[in-house]
Amino acid sequence: MSTENTIVALSTPPGRGALAVVRLSGPKSPDIVHKLTKTTTQLKPRVAQHLNLYKNGELLDDAVIIYYKAPMSYTGEDLVEISCHGSPFIVNQLIELCLRYGARLAQPGEFTRRAFLNGKFDLTQAEAVADLVFSQTQASHQAAIKSLEGTIGKEFAELRSKIIELITILELELDFSDHEIDTIPPQELSKSIDNILKINSKLLKSYSCGKILKQGALVPIIGPPNSGKSSLLNAFLNEERAIVTPYP
């Protein structure tokens, strides 16, 4: 997948609404906007501009356009967000024009993928974007926010740094063990290894907890017939989800 071309996609949910946002990212983004608006004025970064959109010389819509100049954008590339009226017809026409002027349709998640490749996110932050979008509870939301802030990524970076440091010490021991060079006491090496194992264990436990927060947990309610399993389920949900009867 090339990151040298320009991509376009609808950023807001599809369907009819008051507004829709079409996003462009890539080197041709400013030129495509100039063709859409029939203007040659240079776009001002991070300034909302009210401009008309044209198709075949006729007015298509009026829109608010914001230009984010590379590398100070979500993807790290030249990026443009076009806020137009949320008519499916207008959105489709606008995207077709962007394709005609040199863009291609973005693949699912490609904007975030480009942000990752351009160093705007680490991998845990990139995954956290999707986790945040699909979060359904306060706990899953907070976990996604924590990852998006880079907390998990910093812990992985710390683990990597300590492993590299340990490897360096061990290689030094192997290469210069026969020379009169002060070496690290075995107790210090053991302490470093224990520290690495503790960090690794913590990350493994956080993965298990995070998986439950993201995907939920399957909890069976088990018991003999007519022992109140359905009533217990309804009590947990605070609604009559399962059919119950007072008669055995």
Tell me what each language-model feature is.
Residues 4, 120-199, 203:
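Long, non-coiled-coil amphipathic alpha-helical linker/lever segments
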Residues 51, 67, 103, 156-159, ...:
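Generic detector of bulky aromatic hydrophobic side chains
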Residues 1-142, 146, 150:
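A glycine-rich (often HGG/GG-containing) alpha/beta subdomain
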Residues 29, 91, 113, 160-163, ...:
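Alpha-helical structural signal
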Residues 7, 32, 65-66, 82, ...:
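Weak global preference for isoleucine
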